[in-house]
Amino acid sequence: MPILEISDLSKNFGGLKAVTGFSLTLEENEIVGLIGPNGAGKTTIFNLITGIFPVSSGSIKFMGKSILGMPPYKITQLGIARTFQNIRLFKKCTVLDNVRTVFHPRINYGLLDSFLRIARYSAEEERITARSLELLKTMNLADRAEMTAANLPYGDQRRLEIARALAGEPKLLLLDEPAAGMNPSEVGTLVELIRFIRDHFKITILLIEHQMGVVMNVCERLVVLDFGEIIAAGLPEEIRNNKKVLEAYLGKGVTVA
């Protein structure tokens, strides 16, 4: 059974057609890239999947169940997590606490337990801290656990946001331009990290990214959008060699590394 099935999805903002007739099926443990120019509708699709925007028409099924009309928090509980173009962190909190907060909606103790500091509270807090540190280690951030998030370099903030998404224990991870603002060394590390996340956590990944070197190296399939419609889909090599796609949506004379 596919993990995500989107059929004939459309979204209108008044008279503006942001997404038209978008269809996509994701199988378990795939890494699929969603590419296209700014304003093509990529992030709008993420917002439709996660319930931030209501759908104008079409269907979205996650693990065989319709998620249309569900509030974002319920969609998150089902197992869909995402990152954002503009990093969303608790900037005044520590790196560790940024991850710990994601676990707290699923804690196994009550208010009285925390007030009295009983054994169940202590054990659960220790488990949350240990799990958070494991995720920070995966992101190469364990040595910065006590730093304030605002003081992290930009690339580290990106990785912290991914750690927060993973703390929700998702089955589907939506990454919105994770390489934005990273230097070439950080981008290379990110490519390996995305593969590791898929393999280690057994997660399906849908990725929006403008850096073609990233999507060509890490994605198994690519879907190209323009003006809210799919204009090409296929293997990275097929997209790489599609002259129309390169000229119309990546710019004339672009060479994909």
Where are the predicted features?
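Glycine-rich phosphate-binding loops of nucleotide-dependent enzymes
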Residues: 1-257
